[in-house]
């Protein structure tokens, strides 16, 4: 009996004589994949729209005179499909012959050789020789950037790359121009492809037309050893497959995990491996001797550290400050916490870029795959495309399906995302906007607020049209809404207040509340309760310490105030860096211990949805560098601390998970009506961090930094603000903050909020400004 799809009932069909019951509106190719019947395809991909232009999936269907494309034909009651009949095989052989007419016979030099869909399909479904003897066409290759190499003569016009960049990347950066044999893939006006997800078109291309430029001609596919691991560059925790030859990483591709990264990865995850082999990488422990680095052995390094720390601890207690990267694994974080307790120091933290230090609700609040199941979403203060490129794709997909996505941000980088409500304002205005939403929501839901300080703040608030529109979308008769706050909020002086108000809004409407964490193990270290006694990074830096231990970060780039951290390091008597790299930023350190990056160690990360993901080393340690957990374990043994006899990271993980499961309770701060820190008047600095500058490894990945002018810093200002300040495009100005003064060129950008200057953070020429200040400007002479 035929049952209609909206009642979720099934229809009966036959494939190759086999009776099946399937859901209506399912394509033939989807049904075949579900039951393990192979149908060849080039243009079809389960995550992209149907194009049906390669015709390779043509199959015979009973009562149809012509073969039908399996990707574009939906099953019907009683349909009989034949994928192995002579008619189907002859059709597929003809299509294969047609596709190979202009394809060059250059498989021996093609990077796709050995893993090419065209090769495999030609062998399985094609003829043994061609009848075509005419000249083949040649298509000139195009330069579409430093990441993707083009050999467009090989292209079979499947348009997977075109559809991916438009539908997933959000920008139509490639297109199919021309008709018939003149058709070819082209970038618009010969521009490069700049999507943060562009590298996925390399994997999507079924032939060798698009290949990895950094990987080009470096190895054959059968020479590579494939090892699975987890990305360390954002809090999504993308699953990746690393390809290794001679213990050197040659390329990185996605490992499918539908609930996290689906079958995609960001360009940052794909190409950052180049940074692992940068000239700054160190092989041996280094000791500062007359302002020069001298290589020493591990035992000498440990003895030196032991003597210095014991001397400092004997004279003054609690004089050791410990700061680590939020990329630190759970095992390393657990050992750091254990060391700090036994050394009687409470000054330890990992929140290097944050000024909001409340510990409650520091994760996404839901599973990643549940984002699209919400009815309405509000995101506050997140530069999604740079911070979390694949999460941005999920939000965009939600917005395309539901006209109920709203954003409050300081930079309008959401042109490809349909927004019901969009407020572009300075980070310092986020609190007022959320108070407006809370006031409107309270009037609708009659939500009771007990805090007197919030009540007093709401009395002074007037609700604008923009916030009323967002409030209405959140208070409609819906059962599942969500509010997410991003890194821009956590980096604000008012961050805790913003978080409190956002949580009240979520509570008033029964919505999910979540934080979009910045780094691979931000959530894990918070759950581990790494920062003891509510001490935070700023307090560690501002209190004069005799000694600092800093793990896996660059103090000049990765802390929000380079001036303050440099001053703290200068005043200390002995500083220890545990890092894979050495640079001028470490000039205030006395000793550097070479630590392996995540690809050369084992460990565990907890991603934004609180999912634990363990990984093993994919290559051996570089030189005499050692995994972080081993460095800390041996250091603890030299310091004669108790209970550090671990033989593997797995042993540490067991104890660390027990620590996480203790469920530490944290005091939720009350809303504070007055700002603690008064900042001078001026244009507000917006300092988002580009995906290619986020950490030490990515900053050293050469291919990611090869686009023209990509490392040239500019100050981006709204044209209206430029008019008000009497500034013009390409003018050089002097910009000064509380930290430093720099000279920089202006670019006008309508996406930037009014009365602000956008200067990307963590760049060499601009990092000295620090982050989140008011700026004073004057014309450069």
Task: State the predicted function of each range.
Residues 410-411, 417-450, 495, 504, ...:
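Short alpha-helices
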Residues 246-263, 268-277, 282-287, 297, ...:
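Long hydrophobic segments that form regular secondary structure
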Residues 10-33, 41, 45, 60-64, ...:
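N-terminal export/assembly segments and adjacent metallocofactor-ligating motifs
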Residues 210-216, 249-251, 322, 347-349, ...:
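Acidic/polar loop patches that form or flank catalytic/metal-binding clefts of enzymes
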Residues 479-543:
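A glycine-rich, hydrophobic/aromatic-adjacent loop/helix-cap motif
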Residues 5-6:
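Tryptophan (W) side chains
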Residues 44, 337, 373-375, 379, ...:
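A cross-kingdom feature strongest in bacterial/archaeal respiratory oxidoreductases
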Residues 421-424, 431-489:
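Phosphate/pyrophosphate-binding active-site segments
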